[in-house]
UniProtKB/Swiss-Prot annotation:
Main subcellular location: plastid
Binding site residues for NADP(+): 26-50
Protein known as: NADPH-dependent aldehyde reductase-like protein, chloroplastic
Residue numbers annotated as active site: Y178
Enzyme category, top tier: oxidoreductase
Pfam family, any one: adh_short_C2
Keyword Aminoacyl-tRNA synthetase in annotation: no
InterPro entries in UniProt: NAD(P)-bd_dom_sf (IPR036291), Sc_DH/Rdtase_CS (IPR020904), SDR_fam (IPR002347)
EC number(s) on file: 1.1.1.-
Length: 270
């Protein structure tokens, strides 16, 4: 009796596609980049200042077993330094992807973002910190989306996925500038999805709740972390692995009919 079905590997739904994942040297972005690579995509690992971390992610992906479905020249993953709030650097990031993989970009996941670990009230938020938050979180999402809208492959498979936050719904004190910067992105993506009519490119936001990353823990006491965990129906904060399956679904063909949506993934936190 043939044992082919028991030893055959599962199909790779993103084989032959190129994905840029911003802010993917660590945290949720890192987990997303690895997951999309596991689904067959070739990946741009983007970072701003953590070069060694980005190289480790790319090395991990490039060490994946060879699969014949993954076609195209070059490595499975490359590393590109780019500040998403700088237009020329965003353009260069797309240029690098097209050059390295000799193919158009199919998927943009914008995971780059910052959060002020001082958690100031709006009254105590400095103008400089406010501007910096919006520069990265909002302007960065805008610039990446703008470039993607003009350069992603059209006719099917084009995906723009922007990470926002469940803070736009929980409205916790101390997150004023951060939540506002993410809420702006959520409004923008709803309009973007309509403007992309006829291209076959979808645009959505994924809005995680509290996720156990370096950015989440920064500035929080153990007592505060426990309090946040207790607010979840699961009694814990989320992990990056709780977010990546949704991003993988949206990036694939099965997610085509999901468009212009803000999708919370927070375990019932909000």
């Amino acid at each position: 009796m043939s044992t082919h079905s028991s030893i055959s590997q599962p199909p790779l739904p993103l084989a032959g596609r190129v994905a840029i994942v911003t802010g993917s040297s660590r945290g949720i972005g890192r987990a997303i980049a690895i997951h999309l690579a596991e689904l067959g995509a070739r990946i741009v690992i983007n970072y701003t200042s953590k070069a060694a971390d980005a190289e480790r992610v790319a090395s991990e992906i490039n060490d994946f077993p060879v699969r014949e479905e993954i076609t195209g020249k070059g490595p499975r993953a490359i590393v590109v330094q780019a500040n998403v709030s700088e237009p020329s650097q965003v353009k260069s990031m797309f240029d690098a992807a097209e050059s390295a993989f000799e193919a158009p970009v199919h998927i943009l996941v914008n995971s780059a973002g910052i959060l002020d670990p001082k958690y100031p009230t709006i009254a105590d938020t400095s103008v400089e910190d406010f501007d910096h938050t919006f520069s990265v979180n909002t302007k960065g999402a805008f610039l990446c989306s703008k470039e993607a809208a003009n350069r992603l492959k059209q006719g099917g498979g084009g995906r723009i996925i922007l990470l926002t936050s469940s803070q736009t719904r929980s409205l916790k004190p101390g997150f004023g500038a951060y939540a506002a910067s993410k809420a702006a992105v959520e409004t923008m993506v709803k309009i973007l999805a309509k403007e992309l009519k006829g291209t076959g490119i979808t645009a959505n936001c994924v809005a995680p709740g509290p996720i156990a990353t370096e950015m989440f823990f920064d500035g929080k006491t153990p007592e505060l972390v426990e309090k946040i965990a207790a607010e979840s129906p699961f009694g814990r904060v989320g992990e990056a692995k709780d977010v990546v399956p949704l991003v993988g679904f949206l990036a694939g063909d099965g997610g085509e009919w999901v468009n212009g949506q803000i999708i919370p993934v927070n375990g019932g936190y909000v």
